[in-house]
Amino acid sequence: MEAVKAEAWEGAAVAQDLLALGYGGVPGAASRGASCPDFRGLCVRLAAELATLGALEQQREAGAEVLSAGDGPGAEEDFLRQLGSLLRELHCPDRALCGGDGAAALREPGAGLRLLRFLCSELQATRLLCLRSLLDPSPRPPLGEGVVEGAGMVQELDLTLQALGLPRPAPGTPASQLLQELHAKISELQPSLPPGSLQPLLSCSLDAPRWEALESLSQSLRDQYRCRRCLLLKRLDLTTSAFHWSDRAEAQGEAMRAVLIPIREVLTPESDISIAHVLAARADLSCLVPATSVAVRRGTCCAINKVLMGNVPDRGGRPNELEPPMPTWRSRREDGGPQCWGRKKKKKK
């Protein structure tokens, strides 16, 4: 009973996707799989639009069909052979559909609907990407920025492989194969983790209002972070500039700038934390640990904590050390000021 309900729900979802894409509803013989000409024709139309929009990597001759429906005796075999190649090219995650015996897989209950659902999702994503490229007025990034971004992705991938203990893949390894190896390794290590260690921090489903609220909160935090970081960077600039006031710094000024400028250029006020980090965060991130606890200090203490500052010159400026102000200077008056005209006493001899 539950399987029938699930298949009915899947059929309704596929019908809704097809209507949104501008195609007709699900053919009545979708359960018959590749043996149904209407089912093959619908798959052919979906694959043809994918090829037109440039979603396929393999180059084909002009006028060549990605899938052929056909009506002859060998039409079903040709369709299944071409379908297997198409699904592998699109990196379909459904192993049953990409296997060798495609005819038997499509005869299983719900297999035809799964195939249509996958093709519809690929077509929806391709249309969105094409629409984004048409509506985005911003210019394409230059080659240098793309190379830097690609280098960052490669660095993240290297760190992931090192953390999992996997060797670096050989040049030319397909991304799908690498992701499968990562998935297999993570699935192997997951049972050894404590229970609940992979629980997401954000467990509720996000609808449109929640997405807007999350984006607004993220923007507010980024603005506040930028304001605070600008203040810290300004204090850093003032502190480093104070080192150039001494007599010794005049001779070592170029060497000091050669060390400080590359480090300072990396420090930007913008934050690199995005909503993707929030979605990838785990529940243990919300645990508040005292910064002075023994476990935390074991990981944060370093040798510089034991270094004592030497004697530094006293800059003064204390209120109790301030001297009274100097009286203002006044010129002499013309009358010579007050005079005393009394009788003077004679000095004794």
From Swiss-Prot:
Q: Which GO terms describe its cellular component?
A: tRNA-splicing ligase complex
Q: Which InterPro entries match?
A: FAM98 (IPR018797)
Q: Where are the stretches annotated Disordered?
A: 313-349
Looking up Pfam families in the UniProt record yields: DUF2465
Question: What domain of life?
Answer: Eukaryota
Q: Which family does it belong to?
A: Belongs to the FAM98 family.
Q: What is this protein called?
A: Protein FAM98C
Look up and give the organism this protein is from.
Answer: Homo sapiens (Human)
- What are the leading ranks of the lineage? Eukaryota, Metazoa, Chordata, Craniata, Vertebrata
